[in-house]
Amino acid sequence: MHDQSPADPADPSRPPGPTLFDWEFATDPYPAYAWLREHAPVHRTRLPSGVEAWLVTRYADARQALADQRLSKNPAHHAGPAHAKGKTGIPGERKAELMTHLLNIDPPDHTRLRRLVSKAFTPRRVAEFAPRVQELTDHLIGRFEGRGEADLIHEFAFPLPIYAICEMLGVPREDQDDFRDWAGMMIRHGGGPRGGVARSVKQMRAYLGELIHRKRDDLGNDLISDLIRASDHGDHLTEAEATAMAFILLFAGFETTVNLIGNGVHSLFMNPDQRERLQASLAAGESGLLETGVEELLRYDGPVELATWRYATRPLTLGGQAIAVGDPVLVVLAAADRDPERFAEPDTLDLSRSDNQHLGYGHGIHYCLGAPLARLEGQTALGTLLKRLPDLELAVPPTDLRWRGGLIMRGLRTLPVRFTPRND
């Protein structure tokens, strides 16, 4: 089922809106988002699942919605039954346990969990992990650079963050391929209610629960051990909370980085002048353009298209529209980050853009806790690729590329590339 924005009866001159959520939209949603920003910035639509929700597309409205605590993250506040039933693919007996994490709860529970998790997932821990991210990046490129061709999604963008977060969590190396298989099942099917997804989630949950149980008796220098150690005035994470947090750090943390790398390389292919600037900067031993460039890639075609669900707990007005209690609200980060009222020439990729307070990792109390790790991985992956494979290019016409369906994430299914083989 697709949504087409109707003409406004009060304004017959307004043309019918674009069709949303079809194949053409998935390939390039930005013209549709531009139309919505201009004509229906807060727009009620029927999603492919049948659920009706408000899409928020302007930057100012998006920041308001992301920070407005009248919009709850708890699905129990949804007025309708369809989404509240939660087609998550998570087995029913474990659903409540795994869904109790930072993305789905509100203060004061959110405040408590965020404070405890922040004591473990620190900027210092991310900085100390940088050399290992570089080693993983070099290892993965080394596996295909002698061939002269690769699928950058399956051979690089996907395994890098899954292995990185596994190592940071403390998953033994001999078990990491299991996580790659489980994560691959979930990313291919978008977390939908399919048997393979449910089995993968169940297996991942069981493994994490057992790993946390073992680590309580043998704490190490890893993130799970630090989650167990984390204390705030005598308060600790329960085993169920630690399991849920490890699950969401792994699942949410890897897919966003897959898409950051894939979308970022694609954007550089489509904007060769910016790619040349970046390669010249890297060749000169400079890092500044890489750092601002990753921020611009997050704004221009970021990994998260829509923020996760919010539900009105009280009546409110957003962008001139009355939002009723129980209404779902989806903030379209991809649309807000192309808003000409906020960004000069928003449809132009400018790797040196300085005024770039994008919403790629959210805003407010739910700002992405893993953003520093994702930035590190994105900078390391893109910088190393461009230095080691300087003539990297698409191996297929851009029109042959296919984007994954789904509501929240934006990413390519495959990214075939070719380059001069390296055997040194």
Regions found by a protein language model. Name each.
Residues 1-424:
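Cytochrome P450
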